[in-house]
Amino acid sequence: MESRKINLMATAIALIVVAMVVAAADDKTKDKEECTEQLVGMATCLPYVQGQAKSPTPDCCSGLKQVLNSNKKCLCVIIQDRNDPDLGLQINVSLALALPSVCHAAADVTKCPALLHLDPNSPDAQVFYQLAKGLNKTGPASAPTGSSPGPISISPTSGSDDGNNSGRTTSVPGRNHAQSFYKQWLGLEVVFHFFVIFYIFILV
């Protein structure tokens, strides 16, 4: 009997862990889908962040400021998933981190862990802190030039990292409500699984 109870509890705990992992993966996917628009809007920044241009163009800086004004999290997503094969990009992280300073746009990558809902002590969060320290030591690069290269075509994949529509991003109220509902649902799911364990422990 005791062995059966232990097995049931282990199964219930495993179900909760799986549910939480799936929920976390869904949250990251939502971040990627939400920021697909911003990646396309910052297409003119690619030559700079890939190390092919000495300075960003005015169009790049304009697109960056629109992103930071509408959703600061998206710059964090780009940096976090810089090595994602779905992006098909080779991004120089140091240049990407220096971009806000070069474009005279306010951005603080040390806030990325909070924006991405990361544990401050997790390896992913520490990456942002270490990158910020390295940026403070090296300093920003040159200011944007007046010349602008031709438009760059990007074909983001579904679930791709950071950006899908036209670069002019706006906050969509319906999306915010959906995210709020999702978080509430996740909380209720955790409570439900807690009571499942409680029931097994007390009544079985």
From Swiss-Prot:
The lineage of its organism: Eukaryota, Viridiplantae, Streptophyta, Embryophyta, Tracheophyta. It comes from the Eukaryota. Residues 139-163 have a biased composition (Low complexity). GO terms for cellular component: cytosol; plasma membrane; side of membrane. Glycans are attached at N92, N136, N164. Residues 177-204 form a propeptide. Gene3D superfamilies: Plant lipid-transfer and hydrophobic proteins (1.10.110.10). Vascular-specific expression in leaves, roots, stems and inflorescences. Belongs to the plant LTP family. InterPro entries: Bifun_inhib/LTP/seed_sf, Bifunc_inhib/LTP/seed_store, LTSS, Plant_nsLTP. This is Non-specific lipid transfer protein GPI-anchored 14. Pfam families: LTP_2. Keywords: Cell membrane, Disulfide bond, Glycoprotein, GPI-anchor, Lipoprotein, Membrane, Signal. Residues 139-173 are annotated as: Disordered. Disulfide bonds join C35-C76, C45-C60, C61-C103, C74-C112. GO terms for molecular function: lipid binding. It is found in: Cell membrane. Residues 164-173 have a biased composition (Polar residues). GO terms for biological process: leaf senescence; lipid transport; response to herbivore; response to insect. Induction: Accumulates in leaves during senescence mediated by the phloem-feeding green peach aphid (GPA). The gene is LTPG14. Its main location: membrane. SMART domains: AAI (SM00499). PANTHER family: BIFUNCTIONAL INHIBITOR/LIPID-TRANSFER PROTEIN/SEED STORAGE 2S ALBUMIN SUPERFAMILY PROTEIN-RELATED. Residues 1-24 form the signal peptide. A lipid is attached at N176 (GPI-anchor amidated asparagine). It is a lipid-anchor; GPI-anchor. Probable lipid transfer protein.
